[in-house]
């Protein structure tokens, strides 16, 4: 098991593509390789460089060079219409009486940004896969966030998404993890 981390320009993609080269030489087909990165930019760069280096077609040969969110989105058959958008968060805020001007996931790297601290805490707990109230209790709350209000808003957000048939990026990953039929990669 090898995990390669590092800042931009340190050779992560080159190192990984050299490994891909070895796997291809060992007879592993490109579609049996899962190449996942944190950002869309990095995934696109890796796919482009792999296609050039190995004479492959990005669409047909390298469908699994992508971000985890993109992979889950694709495997679950999701559409953009089924994803929470800023307008949905604003509607949720109006229904609950909390101000929300900004709330969205980056399509580049899946990070969540909101001007509402309650939503930020709910999202961060989900990303860390921590119980919401345990996460709340573990942090030094500088901003006045009420524990009970946080819990109720999190429950209401779940209900809102369910009623509307919407998901956020965290839901995608959670749903994917419970999915029975995963691709069986020879190399991940």
Regions flagged by a language model, labelled:
Residues 50, 76, 93-96, 176-181:
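Alpha-helix C-terminal capping segments
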Residues 42, 88, 149:
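Soluble or luminal CAZymes and related metallo-dependent hydrolases
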Residues 1-10, 14-15, 32-34, 104-188:
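Accessory N-terminal region flanking or inserted into the helicase ATPase core
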Residues 86-108:
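Conserved phosphoryl-transfer catalytic core
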